[in-house]
Amino acid sequence: MRVVVQRTREASVTVAGEVVGQIDHGLMLLVGITHEDTEKEVEFVADKIANLRIFEDEEGKMNFSVLDKGGQILSVSQFTLYGDCRKGRRPNFMAAARPEQAEPLYELFNTKLREKGLQVETGRFGAMMDVRLLNDGPVTLIVES
């Protein structure tokens, strides 16, 4: 499992001209699932992200998590995170899980975040989406299982 985590002041995702998910202060997550991922990886990554201390305290030190700050999550599935660009000029996506495997794990990931008390908005799995965000910092990290 691979998740790009971006600290954001605001973010939204649009499908066919309709806003399907929108948050204010919090984290924008681009979520990739690979063949080997199971519930164990999902739980590990959800816990890691919920408790990752990437929000600053009064002294500018990253000391608070999205939970501590009462932030929100915008979670967007993105199989292209498993694109392999080492050979040729076209990415190979063979490492990305097939939709029938990835979608239940993506939904479980969002459920695990909600169970921790986070407000989670999502994109639409498998859809072409327009994602907009105002990156705060910028702070961008990659979390992997």
Curated annotation (Swiss-Prot):
Its EC number is 3.1.1.96. Belongs to the DTD family. It is found in: Cytoplasm. Keywords: Cytoplasm, Hydrolase, RNA-binding, tRNA-binding. GO terms for cellular component: cytoplasm. A motif (Gly-cisPro motif, important for rejection of L-amino acids) lies at residues 137-138. Its main location: cytoplasm. This is D-aminoacyl-tRNA deacylase. Coiled coil: none annotated. An aminoacyl-tRNA editing enzyme that deacylates mischarged D-aminoacyl-tRNAs. Also deacylates mischarged glycyl-tRNA(Ala), protecting cells against glycine mischarging by AlaRS. Acts via tRNA-based rather than protein-based catalysis; rejects L-amino acids rather than detecting D-amino acids in the active site. By recycling D-aminoacyl-tRNA to D-amino acids and free tRNA molecules, this enzyme counteracts the toxicity associated with the formation of D-aminoacyl-tRNA entities in vivo and helps enforce protein L-homochirality. A Gly-cisPro motif from one monomer fits into the active site of the other monomer to allow specific chiral rejection of L-amino acids. It comes from Brevibacillus brevis (strain 47 / JCM 6285 / NBRC 100599). GO terms for molecular function: D-tyrosyl-tRNA(Tyr) deacylase activity; Gly-tRNA(Ala) deacylase activity; Ser(Gly)-tRNA(Ala) hydrolase activity; tRNA binding. GO terms for biological process: D-amino acid catabolic process. It is an enzyme of class 3 (hydrolase).
